């Protein structure tokens, strides 16, 4: 074998390898180009500027507080405001489920109207004290654990109170679930004030229909509620009866779990 090296024009080098095979000669040719690093052309300034140009709307995609995807076509968050509108538009929503009892802000209503988004509002009080004044968490839990005892009343000081909040919560969650599980309403966003407790209860009840184990349901609830996790909410999720909703159609991704 012998190597033959020749100098080529245009600063190129050609190396030829000569091999003898079966009495014949086989040549392999390799061309190597020498690059002058001092003479590399640069893109024009206009082209560089075009590469860096980003539409203003894309720089303002701010998700609402505690935003997350729940399932295909289902999202959750805290109460969205005008800073979140550009982001929400990217979701292509058909519906919003609001779990807040307060009148929906006019600015938000205008946004929904201009984007063809339907609003389903199921007002659930966010503070236990507003529904059960003066009752501590332990007493509220006792109310919840006895919710099927129709004649049961509970004393707080010298006053008596029944269990209105438990029944209202159960009723509102069931109404909201019917909207949530109807795929005609998807894509859909669920929200309360901060996307923790009321939203967590609704999502947790949906998980029961998806046959999640209660440990996983509570883990998801606590992941969003964090240090604000309420024992009362967790008891509600443990006790929520889905038997009357088992025939509700669910065709989205996790329905067969």
Swiss-Prot record:
Disulfide pairings: none
Reactions the enzyme catalyzes: 5-diphospho-1D-myo-inositol 1,2,3,4,6-pentakisphosphate + H2O = 1D-myo-inositol hexakisphosphate + phosphate + H(+); 1,5-bis(diphospho)-1D-myo-inositol 2,3,4,6-tetrakisphosphate + H2O = 1-diphospho-1D-myo-inositol 2,3,4,5,6-pentakisphosphate + phosphate + 2 H(+); 3,5-bis(diphospho)-1D-myo-inositol 1,2,4,6-tetrakisphosphate + H2O = 3-diphospho-1D-myo-inositol 1,2,4,5,6-pentakisphosphate + phosphate + 2 H(+); 6-diphospho-1D-myo-inositol pentakisphosphate + H2O = 1D-myo-inositol hexakisphosphate + phosphate + H(+)
Pfam families xrefs: Y_phosphatase2 (PF03162)
Entry keyword Membrane: no
GO molecular function: identical protein binding; inositol-1,5-bisdiphosphate-2,3,4,6-tetrakisphosphate 5-diphosphatase activity; inositol-3,5-bisdiphosphate-2,3,4,6-tetrakisphosphate 5-diphosphatase activity; inositol-5-diphosphate-1,2,3,4,6-pentakisphosphate diphosphatase activity; phosphatase activity; protein tyrosine phosphatase activity
Residues noted as binding 1D-myo-inositol hexakisphosphate in the record, renumbered to the chain: 168, 172
Active site per the UniProt annotation: 192 (phosphocysteine intermediate)
Domain Tyrosine-protein phosphatase stretches: 66-251
Alphabetized CDD domains for the sequence: PFA-DSP_Siw14
Broad class of enzyme this protein falls into: hydrolase
Function: Cleaves the beta-phosphate at the 5-position of soluble inositol pyrophosphates. Has highest activity on 5-diphosphoinositol 1,2,3,4,6-pentakisphosphate (5-InsP(7)), 1,5-bis-diphosphoinositol 2,3,4,6-tetrakisphosphate (1,5-InsP(8)) and 3,5-InsP(8). Possesses phosphotyrosine phosphatase activity in vitro. Dephosphorylates the phosphoinositides PI(3,5)P2. Hydrolyzes para-nitrophenyl phosphate and O-methylfluorescein phosphate in vitro.
Family listed: Belongs to the protein-tyrosine phosphatase family. Atypical dual-specificity phosphatase Siw14-like subfamily.
Protein name as annotated: Inositol diphosphatase DSP2
Lineage of origin: Eukaryota, Viridiplantae, Streptophyta, Embryophyta, Tracheophyta
């Amino acid at each position: 074998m012998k190597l033959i090296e020749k100098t080529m024009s245009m600063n190129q080098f050609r190396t030829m390898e000569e091999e003898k095979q079966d009495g014949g000669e086989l040549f392999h040719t390799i061309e190597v180009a020498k690059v002058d690093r001092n003479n590399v052309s640069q893109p024009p300034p206009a082209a560089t500027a075009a590469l860096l140009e980003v539409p203003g709307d894309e720089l303002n995609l701010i998700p609402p507080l505690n935003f997350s995807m729940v399932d295909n076509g289902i999202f959750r968050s805290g109460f969205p405001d005008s800073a979140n509108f550009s982001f929400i538009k990217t979701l292509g929503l058909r519906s919003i489920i609001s779990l807040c009892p307060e009148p929906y802000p006019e600015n938000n209503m205008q946004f929904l109207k201009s984007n063809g988004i339907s609003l389903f509002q199921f007002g659930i009080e966010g503070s236990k004290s507003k529904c059960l004044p003066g009752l501590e968490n332990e007493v509220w839990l006792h109310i919840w654990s006895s919710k099927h005892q129709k004649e049961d009343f509970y004393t707080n000081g010298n006053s008596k109170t029944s269990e209105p909040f438990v029944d209202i919560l159960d009723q509102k969650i069931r109404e909201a679930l019917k909207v949530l599980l109807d795929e005609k309403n998807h894509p859909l966003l669920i929200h309360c004030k901060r996307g923790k407790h009321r939203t967590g209860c609704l999502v947790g009840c949906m998980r029961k229909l998806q046959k999640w184990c209660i440990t996983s349901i509570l883990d998801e609830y606590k992941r969003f509620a964090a240090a604000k996790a309420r024992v009362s909410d967790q008891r509600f999720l443990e006790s929520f009866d889905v038997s009357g909703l088992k025939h509700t159609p669910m065709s989205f991704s996790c329905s067969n779990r």
